[in-house]
Amino acid sequence: MGRRFIQTLILLVVLGFPGLPIMAETGNGVATDQAKWIISSGTSASLPSGSLLSLALALERGAETVWLDLVLSKDNQIVLLTDTRIDQLTDVKEIYPDRSRPDGSYYSFDFTLEELRGLSHLPAAPSGSVSATSLFRSHLPVTALDDFLGYLDIVFTELAARPTLICTLKHGWLHQQEDKNLGAIVLQALEDYQSTKANASVVIASYDPEELQQLAQSRGAGQAEDIGFMQLIGSNNGEEVQRLEFGTLQPYSYDLLFTRFGLKSVSSSADSIGLDPQAV
């Protein structure tokens, strides 16, 4: 493993899981005058993660790195959502009450981009709070990756520097069951983006080691070689990755990745590692 790989691993273990905002702040969540946002997914006391408004606020506050959770729509468009199951994230139950699957859940890849854009994020604040009530009355639409990148280009001149984008592939294994290759589509989109933005800093992150290895092997030449790869490690509860074994889905175990062999395998495809707190 290279020195950069080891240093990044230590940094992420110390800071904690970068899927949450990492910043200097007071106990009540209010940033101090000395606060400096390092990594943010846009989550705040009232704004849901991945909404354009929350990401704009993170950039305005000086976030140097923006964490983007990505899923696919029915028409293979990349959307900013923290989960493929969208009934806990949006008002999809109200807009499309008859579109759930037999398990009762609503999935991003059952809706076109146009349909997803018509949905509103549910407020991050507890139900009944002033901020939650105010947000619920407004329309905070689901955002496509292209929309965010377009917004970033517009405000770039107002920023101190173009932020690093950590693009996290959410539930690639579940997309595969729908004959959708989330990783390949995201990689192509980011390669196209980097080809026109020479100073763009982009990282693709995944909880699935096999998915990341396949992407690393298929990465193109030229500027796309500058795209970084981050191996995320979560708990063994199957929340992020599952494998089909003997006809049933089973939680993926990360135990092997904590061995010398596992780390060597990861270092062949990843530039860095991000650990969930419960995995430390």
Task: For the regions a language model picked out, list residue spans one by one.
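Phosphate-group recognition and catalysis centered on beta-loop-alpha active-site segments
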Residues: L20-V280
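Bacterial N-terminal signal peptides
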Residues: T8-P18
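Bacterial N-terminal signal peptides that target proteins for export
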Residues: M1-L9
